[in-house]
Amino acid sequence: MARSAAIERITKETQIKLSLEIDGKGEAQICTSVPFLDHMLDLFARHGLFDLKVEAHGDIDIDFHHTVEDIGIVLGTAFKEALGDKCGIRRYGNAVVPMDEVLASVATDLSGRPYLVYNVELPKVKIGDFDVELVREFFQGFVNHCGANLHLNLMYGDNVHHIVEACFKAAARALDQATQLDARIEGVMSTKGKL
């Protein structure tokens, strides 16, 4: 059974079409009108081995906030839908990723209880036209709609591009681990019997 989802979300601010295949090969087709986010989603798919297609249009003439946040929302929704009842998944995942001088870690629990711990202090700067404070908005939207507990920690690093890239790669690798099916797991990985 394919663990996939196709989501379309239309608001007055954004129009987003997204398809996700959890058991993919890391192939991506990304067009969000936000070049830096395209880059991050491309490497997210690659390092998580998810097949991901995103087409998004938003009110970027105002700024990128709505588009970035809403893509996080739709990606989280797609993961939740693709995982279904979560039977057989490992549930937990973690990754520590270096990117030159940067070291970032992500630990996640696909518990159904959304919570973001974001220990990534970034200067209020732009990478190209991208406000780096939107990284937090992306992950907040993701966890809220995926039902994931996500702890994102920057241990050290200076280059803002490297920091954000390490965070996205670590998130992808942790989610790949958490979504893996394990034949030893009967039902769900919870003493409650439900996630």
From Swiss-Prot:
Lyase recorded as keyword: yes
Reactions catalysed, as given in the entry: D-erythro-1-(imidazol-4-yl)glycerol 3-phosphate = 3-(imidazol-4-yl)-2-oxopropyl phosphate + H2O
Pathway(s) served: Amino-acid biosynthesis; L-histidine biosynthesis; L-histidine from 5-phospho-alpha-D-ribose 1-diphosphate: step 6/9
EC id: 4.2.1.19
Keywords: Amino-acid biosynthesis, Cytoplasm, Histidine biosynthesis, Lyase
GO cellular component: cytoplasm
UniProt-listed CDD domains: IGPD (cd07914)
EC category: lyase
Family: Belongs to the imidazoleglycerol-phosphate dehydratase family.
HAMAP family according to UniProt: HisB
Name of this protein: Imidazoleglycerol-phosphate dehydratase
Organism (species): Citrifermentans bemidjiense (strain ATCC BAA-1014 / DSM 16622 / JCM 12645 / Bem) (Geobacter bemidjiensis)
Gene: hisB
